[in-house]
Amino acid sequence: MNSGTIDGSTSGYPLRFTSGSIGTFTNSGSISYVFSTILLDGSLTIGTLNNAQGASSSALKFSASSKTLPTNYNIIINSLSDFGRLDWTSPSGSTTFGIYSGSTVAAGRYTSVITGLSAGSFTGARSGTYGSYSWVLDNVSGTTWDLVLSLAGPSAADTQSSLARLASNLRGSFNSASLISNFSNTYDCNLFDVKGMCISAGGRYSTVDNPSSNSSAAVVTLGYKVSPNIRIGGFLDQSVNNNSPAGIDISNKHPMMGAFAYWNQNADGLGYQVKVANAYLDKDLSTIRDVIGTSEAGRGNTSLNSRSYVSELSYAFMYKENTLVRPYFALRHTSIEQDAYTETGVTTPLTYSALNDRTTSALMGVKFKHALTPKANLIGSLGVEQDLNNKTDRLTASGVSGLTSENFSGNLYHTRPVASLGATYDITKTQRLAGEVLVQQLPFQSTAGATAYVNYMIGF
């Protein structure tokens, strides 16, 4: 290895290697003689030659008694004006050209990097990639070659890897939308006075793991007692904060909204009960792909909306004196859709097809309310969700040749437990404070979610 200066310009002789073989010879400095710079005697050969000398001085000149080229020749590049040049006199054999792994490259033309070699002197391709660049040896004339580097653009393999990571983060967003939408079907306002009106104000906090995300919202619920056996209502759930997985941003602009209706067999709530409810959520969603290798940090804006519809049949009865038990069975249809979009801010943007998850599920379990005191109650539920039908699109993107769609529904859980526990406290006959925590398994990638909800209810 030579990293300094060897100057034999006044000696009249070249630098001579006379015996043995050289595995790797690296010249990061300068060697200069009157005649050929380096002379190899007899059959002595070099396995790998790495060279930085040339552009900022004279080219590294080689001659050999057998004229045998090194097995591998790697140019060392420090900048567009500082790189290796090789001048080989009357060569025989062949060499494989490459770029030294420690080089600092930029797009452009590196002139006369090799002189003295014909096309037949090269083994293998005279083009390739180095980092995020493509390179090609350009035969500008005779036996003179320029090296041309240009940005290679994102490779299909690296883009596929970044797409797989985006799919994982988007599954987290779909899980979050599913958790929030399904929990909203439990919103109710059932405390009435002489006017048959009810209003509830509260706050919701939801969290999802794998990948981690959370959101909080202010919730307003209204109820109206149509008759002793029928009541209706609606709600608004306005997000105030969203902490989404990396590369995902969900806006707080649009509230989730929904409506519900109950029919009870008896005015006191015992016996059969039929409930129908729906919820609608529409959010602006922004994505940024992770950079993996040559892939680009593509940005995109789209919308994420979910719709859920629930029909529930239950039967309430008293167990002993202080406990109300309500077994239930329900059917729920949920649709979560991300609109199609095209990335911006990159040289090779990806275009994504719409992504939709449609699920019909059966829900069964039991709810209870246990009177702790005349004013305080313990409430809770235990149940299971079973998917009856599910259709999930694949995450499909185009824009880079060779991409394949990602299986968005991989590791999907079709049977999911759900449980809740909470308490209510009647401040007065027409005022109630309540809190509840619900925990459930979510559909995508072995994920659990939890929601805490606290509200203050007033009856009129």
Short names for language-model regions:
Residues 242, 246-248, 282-302, 337-358, ...:
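Solvent-exposed, glycine/polar-rich loop segments of beta-barrel outer-membrane systems
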Residues 61-153:
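Extracellular, surface-exposed repeat/solenoid domains
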Residues 32, 56-67, 141-193, 389-408, ...:
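Primarily extracellular Gram-negative trimeric autotransporter adhesin
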Residues 1, 12-20, 32-43, 57-65, ...:
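Glycine-rich beta-solenoid repeat tracts in large extracellular/virion proteins
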